[in-house]
């Protein structure tokens, strides 16, 4: 009997350790900026990958240690495509990103650095929830941990991007939803005219009783109420896409995943029905057994020119690569069986028809 209990405990611990995720790198216009999840990087990273479950916690702003600046700030311009890269442990091809049971929405907020770090001025600039039987997290896993936004046409200055996952596998009980977030340090070098609105406070934007936080993914439903404020209508006013800049002085770290991917890509087959088994060990924050991400090499700061999308001998664009968008000058005809899907005005992508 003791042996049986021991095996069950080990299985639960292993399952629990494979549940969680952090943002470990970003890409700018398809160029890998290298690992940023360290004190010498550009992401204000927590000490481990544990989620937050108390929506009133001060750590909801930028996660644990999120008030502490890190060494680097990445230069970006209006119209740049920013891709966030999430992982469970590290950036290796074998990493499982986040447990597939952790279905839920993904959102991105933006705030001026000083104001945002104090928990104020957060403006939602992107969100993805539930559509056609798939959750944003399903698409994130299929896309090897990547989802993208476009930099709005805001005034020049220092800003924080705050990508966030809400895992709802225990959202059927009050206080069970799990929140994962980090803050990425950027400096907008273009000088746009669309100043951010007043925004919301985080903590403060969510309540444990919000329909999109206290939500049962295992019962029948046809839609999902996104939590928090609406997406800012100025988020789509991103100005002109940037011209290529000089290559980085250091060779960027390149992963096996494609370099130009948006959030809604390469879907996996999922349903709203309950899975055969769910995590039984995800509860209060202090109870998690987690793994601290392995140290990564320091990041580069200057983006390089975007590589053209791979093409067939006929000149058509392969699946998952860019086929259009504002200021895009490459091939626009997708391979047979694919269509050019517009995700936003700056990024169109070849996907299966």
UniProtKB/Swiss-Prot annotation:
Region called Disordered, residue ranges: 266-316
Co-factor remark: Binds 1 copper ion per subunit.
Glycosylation sites (chain numbering): 327
Organism superkingdom: Eukaryota
Catalysed reactions listed for this entry: [(1->4)-beta-D-glucosyl]n+m + reduced acceptor + O2 = 4-dehydro-beta-D-glucosyl-[(1->4)-beta-D-glucosyl]n-1 + [(1->4)-beta-D-glucosyl]m + acceptor + H2O
Transcription found in the keyword field: no
CBM1 domain segment(s): 315-351
UniProt-listed InterPro entries: AA9, AA9_LPMO, CBD_sf, Cellulose-bd_dom_fun
Any single Pfam family the record assigns to this protein: CBM_1
Signal peptide location: 1-19
Bias (Low complexity) ranges: 266-276, 291-304
One GO biological process term: cellulose catabolic process
Summary of the protein's practical applications: Lignocellulose is the most abundant polymeric composite on Earth and is a recalcitrant but promising renewable substrate for industrial biotechnology applications. Together with cellobiose dehydrogenases (CDHs) an enzymatic system capable of oxidative cellulose cleavage is formed, which increases the efficiency of cellulases and put LPMOs at focus of biofuel research.
Keyword ATP-binding: no
Listed Gene3D superfamilies: 2.70.50.70
Amino-acid positions noted as binding O2 in the UniProt annotation, renumbered to this chain: 169
E.C. no: 1.14.99.56
Intracellular or extracellular location(s): Secreted
Binding-site positions, Cu(2+): 20, 102, 180
Needed cofactors: Cu(2+)
Keyword field: Carbohydrate metabolism, Cellulose degradation, Copper, Disulfide bond, Glycoprotein, Metal-binding, Monooxygenase, Oxidoreductase, Polysaccharide degradation, Secreted, Signal
Functional description taken from the UniProt entry: Lytic polysaccharide monooxygenase (LPMO) that depolymerizes crystalline and amorphous polysaccharides via the oxidation of scissile alpha- or beta-(1-4)-glycosidic bonds, yielding C4 oxidation products. Catalysis by LPMOs requires the reduction of the active-site copper from Cu(II) to Cu(I) by a reducing agent and H(2)O(2) or O(2) as a cosubstrate.
Family per similarity comment: Belongs to the polysaccharide monooxygenase AA9 family.
Stored PANTHER family: ENDO-BETA-1,4-GLUCANASE D (PTHR33353:SF17), PUTATIVE (AFU_ORTHOLOGUE AFUA_1G12560)-RELATED (PTHR33353)
Recorded domain comment: Has a modular structure: an endo-beta-1,4-glucanase catalytic module at the N-terminus, a linker rich in serines and threonines, and a C-terminal carbohydrate-binding module (CBM). The CBM domain is essential for binding to and subsequent oxidative degradation of polysaccharide substrate.
Protein name, UniProt field: AA9 family lytic polysaccharide monooxygenase A
Organism listed in the record: Aspergillus clavatus (strain ATCC 1007 / CBS 513.65 / DSM 816 / NCTC 3887 / NRRL 1 / QM 1276 / 107)
């Amino acid at each position: 009997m003791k042996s049986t209990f021991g095996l069950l405990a080990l299985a639960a611990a292993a399952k629990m350790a494979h549940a969680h995720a952090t943002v470990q790198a970003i890409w700018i216009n398809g160029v890998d900026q290298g690992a940023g999840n360290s004190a010498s990087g550009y992401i204000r990273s927590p000490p481990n990958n544990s989620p937050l479950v108390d929506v009133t916690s001060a750590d909801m702003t930028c996660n644990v240690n999120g008030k502490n600046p890190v060494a680097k700030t990445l230069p970006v311009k209006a119209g740049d495509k920013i891709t966030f890269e999430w992982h469970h442990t590290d950036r290796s091809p074998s990493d499982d990103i986040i447990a597939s049971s952790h279905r839920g929405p993904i959102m991105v907020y933006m705030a001026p650095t000083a104001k945002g770090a104090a928990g104020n001025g957060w403006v939602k600039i992107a969100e993805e929830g539930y559509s056609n039987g798939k959750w944003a997290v399903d698409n994130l896993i299929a896309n090897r941990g990547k989802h993208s936004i476009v930099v709005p046409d805001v005034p020049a200055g220092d800003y924080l991007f705050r990508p966030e996952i809400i895992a709802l596998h225990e959202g059927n009980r009050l206080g069970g939803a799990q929140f994962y977030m980090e803050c990425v340090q950027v400096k907008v070098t273009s000088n746009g005219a669309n100043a951010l609105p007043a925004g919301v406070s985080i903590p403060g934007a969510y309540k444990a009783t919000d329909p999109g936080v206290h939500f049962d993914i295992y019962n029948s439903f046809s839609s999902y109420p996104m939590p928090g404020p609406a997406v800012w209508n100025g988020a789509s006013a991103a100005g002109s896409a940037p011209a290529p800049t000089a290559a980085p002085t250091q060779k960027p770290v390149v992963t096996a995943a494609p370099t130009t991917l948006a959030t809604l890509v390469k879907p996996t087959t999922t349903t709203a029905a309950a899975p055969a088994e769910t995590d039984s060990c995800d509860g209060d924050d202090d109870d998690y057994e987690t793994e601290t991400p392995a140290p990564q090499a320091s990041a580069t700061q200057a983006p390089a020119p975007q590589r053209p999308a791979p093409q067939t001998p006929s000149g058509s664009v392969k699946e998952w690569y860019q086929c259009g968008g504002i200021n895009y000058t490459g091939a626009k005809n997708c391979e047979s069986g694919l269509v050019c899907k517009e995700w936003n005005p700056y990024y169109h992508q070849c996907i299966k028809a």
